[in-house]
Amino acid sequence: MFDKIKNFSEILSNMGSFREKMEEVKKRIASIRVVGDAGAGMVTVTASGEGQITNVFINKQLFDADDNKMLEDLVMAATNDALKKAKEATAYEFQSASGGLDFSEISKMFGGKFG
């Protein structure tokens, strides 16, 4: 019984440093910027580690094209590429901070945003 109390006490005493580490990870994630591209760079989309689109570039040659569907497909592909990279970068930050723990199960509890 006392061992369980001791273990619980150790967990509580480490919560402060864990909380600090998670705050540091949140700051690093907020500063992450990744670029997804499609059409050999004709469309690029920048996303933050938080999964927000921060920039979209479309080569002006695509505006002259008669095929809007192609442009739509390229924007969608570049966006999905950027969001995938952001998710991977975020998962890496969490795993690095946790000593390699897999956060995929914990992430599911938070809507799947972190790995």
From Swiss-Prot:
- Report the locations given in the UniProt record: Cytoplasm, Nucleoid
Q: Does the keyword Mitochondrion apply?
A: no
Q: Pfam families, alphabetically?
A: YbaB_DNA_bd
Q: Which domain of life is it from?
A: Bacteria
Q: Which Gene3D superfamilies does the UniProt record give? A: Nucleoid-associated protein YbaB-like domain (3.30.1310.10)
Q: Which GO terms describe its cellular component?
A: bacterial nucleoid; cytosol
Q: What does this protein do?
A: Binds to DNA and alters its conformation. May be involved in regulation of gene expression, nucleoid organization and DNA protection.
Assembly, in brief, is: Homodimer.
> What is the protein named?
Nucleoid-associated protein LA_4332
Q: Which organism is it from?
A: Leptospira interrogans serogroup Icterohaemorrhagiae serovar Lai (strain 56601)
Specify the taxonomic lineage. Bacteria, Pseudomonadati, Spirochaetota, Spirochaetia, Leptospirales
